[in-house]
């Protein structure tokens, strides 16, 4: 999804550069927060649930 959106912004006029920078700044903190929460839950959870969580995480990414 991210690659497709980047290619779209490139095809647009120079205005896309401004939008791209704004979206990048807003998205980076959101992504960091999601990764942090996922890592914390993984550590607290046991081995069996760990494998199940990884499968769910992969489905979300794709």
From Swiss-Prot:
One of its GO terms (biological process) is sperm DNA condensation. It comes from Gallus gallus. One of its GO terms (molecular function) is DNA binding. The modification Phosphothreonine is found at residue 9. It is found in: Nucleus; Chromosome. Belongs to the protamine P1 family. Testis. The keyword Cytoplasm does not apply. One of its GO terms (cellular component) is nucleus. Residues 1-62 are annotated as: Disordered. Protamines substitute for histones in the chromatin of sperm during the haploid phase of spermatogenesis. They compact sperm DNA into a highly condensed, stable and inactive complex. This is Sperm histone. Keywords: Chromosome, Developmental protein, Differentiation, DNA condensation, DNA-binding, Nucleosome core, Nucleus, Phosphoprotein, Spermatogenesis. The keyword DNA-binding applies.
